[in-house]
Amino acid sequence: MKVRATIICEQDRHVLLVRKQGGRWTLPGGKLERGESAADAAIRELWEETGLRVDELIYVLELETDGTRHHVFEVSVLNLEQLRPLNEITDCIWHPLDALHNLNISDAMRSIVSAYVRRL
């Protein structure tokens, strides 16, 4: 089973989404490196994909979908004004939490955001 750190960065009922060239919108995150904790992977992936530095990291939930275990974290960041797509990421957007049904996102991401919204 693949293990992934998935990040929810929410501001004013909008969630940060990223996209690779030609890909679907998704929450920032990625696979854990050997010996890396899920929390450390979340911090690293957010920085590598968006340039954002984590101020606070809260473990929200664990969800298994399609052979992947997602460790989901909510973050607050120190440098929101420095948001930009980096490395393999070509786009970043803030999208309303209540309008994700309008986007091309995976069922896994939809499930994660739905579980997060139920906790609010």
Predicted regions and their residues:
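Conserved N-terminal beta-strand and adjoining loop/helix that marks the start
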Residues: 1-15
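Structural detector for helix-capping/boundary residues
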Residues: 30, 44, 95-98, 103
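Residues that recognize and position ribonucleotide moieties
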Residues: 8, 25, 93
